[in-house]
Amino acid sequence: MEHKEAGCQQPEGPILCINNCGFFGSAATMNMCSKCHKEMIMKEEQAKLAASSIDSIVNGCDGGKEHIVAASGSTAVAVAQVEAKTLVVQPTDVAGTSEEVAVVPKVKEGPNRCATCRKRVGLTGFNCRCGNMYCALHRYSDKHECQFDYRTAARDAIAKANPVVKAEKLDKI
């Protein structure tokens, strides 16, 4: 007996993906495998988004509005327009700022030297809190007559790290 169906006939074997990736495709995904089909859909969506963003830049659309771009099928993707950030430049008075020029400290170039014995220290120099660089012999504060007050700095650091907590006095009943 011969069985005839009107319209659709099932293919006799599995169909390879049209991108020749080695996987099998289906008629529902345009003879592509699921991976290639998803990649194709993503590329189409990106192309549509790029085209719409270029159109909005060229046409000068408002930055605060949202536009809805129809994607494949019944899905819709809301695309928020990116507001262009403008840089506000305020003109300054050239004559008024000539007296207010801030002095920028010069960075020492050349060989690094000990501030006490003037010995070259290079990369092995020790920076002190007083702002100078010293060799291994003069790196300690008692060896180079350091002007930095370590006692006050330590006292301030401890006070800052451990604040005094005083509770209010309780009323006697």
From Swiss-Prot:
Q: Which InterPro entries match?
A: AN1-like_Znf, AN1_A20_ZnFinger, Znf_A20, Znf_AN1
Alphabetically list the UniProt keywords.
Metal-binding, Stress response, Zinc, Zinc-finger
| Segments forming AN1-type zinc fingers | 108-154
Give residues annotated as binding Zn(2+) 3: C128, C130, H144, C146
Q: Induction of this protein: by what?
A: By cold, dehydration and salt stress.
Q: State any single GO MF term.
A: zinc ion binding
A Pfam short name: zf-A20
Q: Which residues are recorded as binding Zn(2+) 1? A: C17, C21, C33, C36
Residues reported to bind Zn(2+) 2: C114, C117, C135, H138
Keyword Zinc-finger assigned: yes
Q: Which intervals hold the zinc fingers (A20-type)?
A: 11-45
Question: Record's PANTHER family?
Answer: AN1-TYPE ZINC FINGER PROTEIN, ZINC FINGER A20 AND AN1 DOMAIN-CONTAINING STRESS-ASSOCIATED PROTEIN 4
Q: What does this protein do?
A: May be involved in environmental stress response.
Q: What is this protein called?
A: Zinc finger A20 and AN1 domain-containing stress-associated protein 4
Quote the gene name from the UniProt entry.
Answer: SAP4
